[in-house]
Swiss-Prot record:
InterPro entries: G_TrmE, GTP-bd, GTP-bd_TrmE_N, GTPase_MnmE, MnmE_dom2, MnmE_helical, P-loop_NTPase, Small_GTP-bd. Its main location: cytoplasm. Binds 1 potassium ion per subunit. This is tRNA modification GTPase MnmE. Its cofactor is K(+). Exhibits a very high intrinsic GTPase hydrolysis rate. Involved in the addition of a carboxymethylaminomethyl (cmnm) group at the wobble position (U34) of certain tRNAs, forming tRNA-cmnm(5)s(2)U34.
Length: 453
């Protein structure tokens, strides 16, 4: 990281009541002397004139000075809070840039300074952007929890446990007790199992946090003419898909992005699944399976007039058996207006079964509540945190190494290989908070931030 002093507008561009210019770095004091004529008392609000190089007043407002390292960035920080007209703010930034050694900040560079100066870790820095971009109350609360260190705390605890176990294994290898076989005495195995269990819990929370941040991808799938497109239209609240009585009308993937009480939901309507010799329809079915395999949830659409079954294994075993092992499935028995079924939800062998009429809209509101619940809308979010895809990937890598380490211990009693898998898990977990992170990744993360953050 450079030692340049940087400046940027901290408030959103455009017209507003208040506009804030932020300066961070060693030259912040020089800016204060040039623009204000004095250095404000540290951490006190100072109402004063903001002047150009000839002494003319550009604006009037509040100046705040924070002496490093006791600032957000860890550097000397000066904030000039004036009126929110864009012309005035541009004039003020131009004046600041006249001071030698000042340059415009890159996107996210203030947060990057804070990260480099150990004022916050990478998950907390990312949480700043997530809090700004939050599209729901749940997302905002979870982002704030991450900003306050809840996610970091969980990861640090895992890193410490993995590190301690690794050091114990390595020490036992280097200084063996001839009377005790340390690999088979149960102590290491018990510690490893506890770490794996805790990691599994953190993965589940991170998965929920990722859904709250990025939205849940829901794929509507089933046989032709089951009412999939009608359900897409009912959930979207508009005629997004063409609906006819002709089986196979939908041949390509249709997407709708909606919000349920602020919770982002990505709905995918797919071609009806069946054996066909039609080349175009075959392509649509192949695309349907691609969407299913990357879904967070599948709505298995069933024409209720064709079967009384509710267990998906009885309805279409080949379809269920082809689904990814951990993919959640909700069974939708459609056309309840024709079958006369009660519009209710039941649990059948671990599956939620909803009875609706996509055509008339009956039961769709209950289904929406179900989808909101899956996204965490009704959950108690105390202690919950926001998570990104890269966090999930790092947790998955760590889990994979721990499972490999478990195999080395249980099957081969290979202490050296167990220690190596623990080391790799430690690195994967440390990438989440930025303890071990490449410069390329840091650049990618911070470049997605706002200029003044």
């Amino acid at each position: 990281m450079t030692t340049d002093t940087i400046v940027a507008q901290a408030t959103a561009p455009g017209r507003g009541g208040v506009g804030i210019i932020r300066i961070s770095g060693d030259k912040a004091t020089d800016v204060a002397m040039a623009v204000l004529g004095h250095l404000p008392k540290t951490r006190y609000a100072d109402y004063c004139d903001f002047k150009n190089a000839t002494g003319q007043v550009i604006d009037q407002g509040i100046a705040l000075f924070f002496k490093g390292p006791n600032s957000f960035t860890g550097e000397d920080v000066l904030e000039l809070q004036g009126h929110g007209g864009q012309i005035v703010l541009d004039m003020l930034i131009k004046r600041v840039l006249e001071v030698e050694g000042i340059r415009i900040a890159k996107p996210g560079e203030f947060s990057e300074q804070a990260f480099m100066n150990d004022k916050l870790d990478l998950t907390q820095a990312e949480a700043i952007a997530d809090l700004i971009d939050a599209t729901s109350e749940q997302a905002a609360k979870s982002a704030l929890q991450s900003l306050q260190g809840e996610f970091s705390k969980e990861v640090h605890e895992l890193v410490d446990q993995v590190t301690n176990l690794r050091l114990y294994v390595e020490a036992a290898i280097d200084f063996p007790d001839e009377e005790v076989d340390f690999l088979s005495d149960g102590k290491i195995a018990n510690a490893l199992y506890k770490i794996i269990d805790k990691l599994s819990t953190v993965q589940a929370s991170a998965k929920q946090g990722s859904i709250i941040r990025e939205g849940m991808k829901v794929v509507i799938a089933g046989r032709p003419n089951a009412g999939k497109s009608s359900l897409l239209n009912a959930l979207a609240g508009k005629e997004s898909a063409i609906v006819t009585e002709i089986a196979g009308t939908t041949r390509d993937v249709l997407r709708e992005h909606i919000h349920l009480d602020g919770m982002p939901l990505h709905i995918i309507d797919t071609a009806g699944l069946r054996d066909t010799t039609d080349t175009v329809e075959q392509i649509g079915i192949e695309r349907a399976w691609n969407e299913i395999n990357s879904a967070d949830r599948v709505l298995f659409m069933v024409d209720g007039t064709t079967t009384d079954a509710v267990d998906p294994h009885d309805i279409w075993p080949d379809f269920i058996n082809r689904l990814p092992a951990n993919l959640g499935v909700t069974v939708i028995r459609n056309k309840a207006d024709l079958t006369g079924e009660n519009l209710d939800m039941t649990e059948e062998k671990g599956y939620s079964v909803y009875r609706i009429s996509a055509k008339t809209g009956l039961g769709v509101d209950e289904l929406k509540l179900h989808l909101k619940s899956l996204m965490g809308y009704q959950s108690n979010l105390e202690g919950g945190f926001i998570a990104r895809r890269r966090h999930l990937e790092a947790l998955d890598v760590a889990a994979s190494h721990l499972q490999l380490g478990k195999e080395q211990l249980e099957v081969y009693l290979a202490g050296e290989l167990l220690a190596e898998e623990l080391r790799m898990a430690q690195i994967a977990l440390s990438e989440i908070t930025g303890r071990f992170t490449s410069d390329d990744l840091l650049g990618k993360i911070f470049s997605s931030f706002c200029i003044g953050k």
